[in-house]
């Protein structure tokens, strides 16, 4: 019973990932997702969101615009392994040792350790993430200034991540995975030719 009007040609050539509202890391780690699944408001709760693309090869870049950072030591952005979830309610990717993050207090978190890394960041800052899965390295930027290579030897499939590990602190952000460099109108579009930008 199919006719021509029941069919739709799909030729995906310019796809962008978003935050995945159903791929929260564990129970009680959900916030409120809006703006085409690019904005996350954590509602003063623990959050851990992965993006919809798993990355195992190639070079990738995305940016996170910081809206609210309640407690710098617990607000993080970076990557974590795909196909891993918390073993209990509230168990996040940092607890599981499956994340590489640049923390708002300037520290880094990598599987098995933490330490000093770069400048602190706050509300109004943009954190860029440059991931080279061919070389297995990740480098972060604060407002276009490199913070240096943070880690190497990354051989797992990973996905972009934002997480906040203090139930009493707010962490709200908007992502740009290439589709909207205005961060839902929070900034002036950078004119990169993304859909809805110019």
Which residues does each predicted region cover?
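PRY/SPRY (B30.2) beta-sandwich protein-interaction domains
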Residues: 1-198
């Amino acid at each position: 019973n199919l006719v021509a009007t029941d069919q739709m040609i799909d030729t995906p050539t310019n796809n962008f990932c978003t935050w995945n509202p159903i791929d929260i890391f564990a129970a009680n780690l959900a916030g409120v997702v809006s703006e085409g699944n690019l904005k996350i408001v954590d509602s003063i709760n623990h959050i851990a969101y992965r993006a919809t693309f798993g990355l195992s090869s190639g070079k990738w870049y995305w940016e996170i615009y910081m809206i609210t950072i309640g407690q710098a030591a617990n607000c993080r952005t970076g990557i974590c392994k795909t196909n891993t979830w918390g073993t209990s309610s509230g168990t996040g990717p940092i607890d599981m040792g499956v994340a590489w993050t640049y923390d708002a207090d300037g520290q880094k978190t990598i599987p098995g350790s933490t330490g000093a890394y770069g400048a602190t960041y706050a509300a109004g800052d943009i954190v860029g993430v440059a991931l080279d899965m061919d070389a297995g390295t990740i480098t972060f930027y604060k407002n276009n200034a490199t913070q240096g290579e943070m880690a190497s030897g990354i051989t797992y499939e990973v996905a972009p991540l934002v997480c906040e590990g203090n139930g009493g602190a707010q962490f709200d952000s908007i992502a740009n995975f290439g589709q909207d460099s205005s961060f839902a109108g929070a900034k002036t579009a950078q004119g990169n030719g993304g859909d809805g930008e110019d």
